């Protein structure tokens, strides 16, 4: 008879404890914060009442009574929980003695408070994870949009490259089908013949210069032939015609003038200095004063006049 009653009393205690924890969790979730802790009603098992009920046995009742914690006791328990959420036997006895509570009441309150603290911690973690998840979702959406934009740009660039390549291939194919250009015409041959590095025009110029009566070779040839005329025909016969006299007088003067100018040029090229330049000037003066110095010439015929 006693065994079923004990089993029923233990089942009733477990059921009451679970109901109390559920009520505490519900009140925490609905109220939230320290104000809810102060206003909530905590019901704990009284060990004295439970022991009396268990000893009575056949009284037919559990003999349990509930006690409500005061607001001051709840605040003191909150301060103790914030200091340390673990409850050892010595600390439990000290808190119970200070607050005039049963040690079992202190243990149940700490147990419920740890459950609420864990629930609140889970809620904070869930809120942090949810905010992070939302941020990641926004970032993922932005990355997806960027990916789509880049894919569209790549497709556009690929189309452009394909179009340019097709145009180039068509141009190359057209160039291959075109016939090659005709070869350039051969260069025209020159009519003038080159003989010993000089053309006919150069040869004719040299020939004309040699044939000219004013060239140096003609004058030199006439100068060398003049003394022979002195010996053969005589002085009077050489100057007999007036035209011959005029021509004979003109050629030596030109010869002397050319010799003076040639000497002047040699002095300037050879670097004879101021004296050489002065002599050259004197030679030039002698050329222009031909009548004064003509008496010194061997062929001058003034005495015969």
UniProtKB/Swiss-Prot annotation:
This is Homeobox-leucine zipper protein HOX8. Residues 37-49 have a biased composition (Acidic residues). Transmembrane segments: none annotated. Residues 62-121 bind DNA. Expressed in seedlings, roots, stems, leaf blades and panicles. One of its GO terms (cellular component) is nucleus. It holds the Pfam family HALZ. Keywords: DNA-binding, Homeobox, Nucleus, Transcription, Transcription regulation. Residues 179-188 have a biased composition (Pro residues). Coiled coil: none annotated. Belongs to the HD-ZIP homeobox family. Class I subfamily.
């Amino acid at each position: 008879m006693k065994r079923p009653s004990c089993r029923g009393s233990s089942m009733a205690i477990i059921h009451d404890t679970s109901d109390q924890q559920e009520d505490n969790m519900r009140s925490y979730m609905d109220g939230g914060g320290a104000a809810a802790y102060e206003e909530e009603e905590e019901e704990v098992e009284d060990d004295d009442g439970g022991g009396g009920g268990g000893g009575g046995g056949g009284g037919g009742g559990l003999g349990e009574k509930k006690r409500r914690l005061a607001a001051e006791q709840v605040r003191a328990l909150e301060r103790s929980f914030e200091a340390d959420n673990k409850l050892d036997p010595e600390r439990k006895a000290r808190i119970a003695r200070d607050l005039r509570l049963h040690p079992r009441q202190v243990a149940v309150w700490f147990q419920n408070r740890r459950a609420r603290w864990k629930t609140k911690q889970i809620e904070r973690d869930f809120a942090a994870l949810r905010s992070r998840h939302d941020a990641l979702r926004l970032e993922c959406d932005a990355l997806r949009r960027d990916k789509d934009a880049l894919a569209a740009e790549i497709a556009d660039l690929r189309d452009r490259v394909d179009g340019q390549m097709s145009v180039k291939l068509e141009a190359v194919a057209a160039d291959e089908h075109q016939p090659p250009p005709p070869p350039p015409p051969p260069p025209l041959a020159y009519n003038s013949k080159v003989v010993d590095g000089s053309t006919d025009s150069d040869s004719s110029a040299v020939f004309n210069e040699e044939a000219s009566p004013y060239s140096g070779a003609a004058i030199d040839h006439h100068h060398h032939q003049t003394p022979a005329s002195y010996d053969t025909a005589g002085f009077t016969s050489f100057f007999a015609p007036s035209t011959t006299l005029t021509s004979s007088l003109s050629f030596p003067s030109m010869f002397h003038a050319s010799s003076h100018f040639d000497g002047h040029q040699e002095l300037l090229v050879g670097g004879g200095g101021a004296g050489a330049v002065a002599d050259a000037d004197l030679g030039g003066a002698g050329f222009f004063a031909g009548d004064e110095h003509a008496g010194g010439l061997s062929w001058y015929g003034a005495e015969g006049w």
